[in-house]
Amino acid sequence: MDQSIQVNINEVNQALERKDSLDVIKWAYKTYGDKLVYACSMGAEGMVLIDLISKVRPDAPVIFLDTDFHFSETYELIERVKERYPKLQLKLVKPELTPEEQAETYGDRLWERQPDLCCKLRKLVPLEKELAQYDAWMSGLRRDQSPTRTNTQFVNEDRRFGSTKICPLIHWTSEEIWMYIELHQLPYNDLHDKQYPSIGCEYCTRPVKEGEDERAGRWSNTSKTECGLHQ
């Protein structure tokens, strides 16, 4: 059985402190190689990170958690990403239960009654099974996205999944993300042009009002702020 790759997270973060995102990505693939996967939500940050990754590892494995509840615009974006990056190993990871099976087992509109359970069934459990094949995973988290993400480092211990989480974009602002997208003419979700800065499942995402933070449109009628992937 292969041994997992271990790193001293504090030492690595000190070494990477003054490095840029591309340096972090290069370090990640040099360290983990094929044992590293990018879990992409197909948000604006995801488009930037895919583009940066393609410069280092064009055939990198990338997974998207297909909950079956995403906007049609999100699925359309996935096809455009495949066209732009044909070497990318993009895999859609599905839950065990279809929406119909989930409704039969747990009742209709579970996302309204028990959003944490819905996220667990359709996101957390599938991701946990997928990450078991890898030693580390990459994420497009940024510190200024929300108060829950302000302490994110380049390299993080991920107790939730027993893994290492690498976040190359922690210092980027929303403005810098969009400058990069426009400069390189990257594909992006059309909903971003309709006041959706953060896009998740269709049932749990609304447009954001002026003055709200980027993730205010996620689970807006509940106290929930994260799906559980980054806690």
Swiss-Prot record:
Q: Where in the cell is it found?
A: Cytoplasm
Record has Iron-sulfur as a keyword: yes
Q: What does the record note about the cofactor?
A: Binds 1 [4Fe-4S] cluster per subunit.
- What InterPro entries does the entry give? APS_reductase, PAPS/APS_Rdtase, PAPS_reduct_dom, Rossmann-like_a/b/a_fold
**So which domain of life are we looking at?**
Bacteria
**Which molecular-function annotations from GO does this UniProt entry contain?**
4 iron, 4 sulfur cluster binding; adenylyl-sulfate reductase (thioredoxin) activity; metal ion binding; phosphoadenylyl-sulfate reductase (thioredoxin) activity
Which Enzyme Commission number(s) are listed? 1.8.4.10
Instruction: Identify the keywords attached in UniProt to this record, alphabetized.
Output: Cytoplasm, Iron, Iron-sulfur, Metal-binding, Oxidoreductase
What Pfam families is this protein classified in? PAPS_reduct
Record pathway: Sulfur metabolism; hydrogen sulfide biosynthesis; sulfite from sulfate
Q: Which Gene3D superfamilies match?
A: HUPs
**Entry GO terms, CC:** cytoplasm
Record-level GO BP terms = cysteine biosynthetic process; hydrogen sulfide biosynthetic process; sulfate assimilation, phosphoadenylyl sulfate reduction by phosphoadenylyl-sulfate reductase (thioredoxin)
Query: Which residue positions are annotated as catalytic?
Result: C227
Record-linked NCBIfam families: APS_reductase, cysH, PRK02090.1
> What is this protein for, i.e. what is its function?
Catalyzes the formation of sulfite from adenosine 5'-phosphosulfate (APS) using thioredoxin as an electron donor.
Q: Which HAMAP family match?
A: CysH
**What's the protein name?**
Adenosine 5'-phosphosulfate reductase
Which species is this record about?
A: Halalkalibacterium halodurans (strain ATCC BAA-125 / DSM 18197 / FERM 7344 / JCM 9153 / C-125)
What gene codes for this chain? Answer: cysH
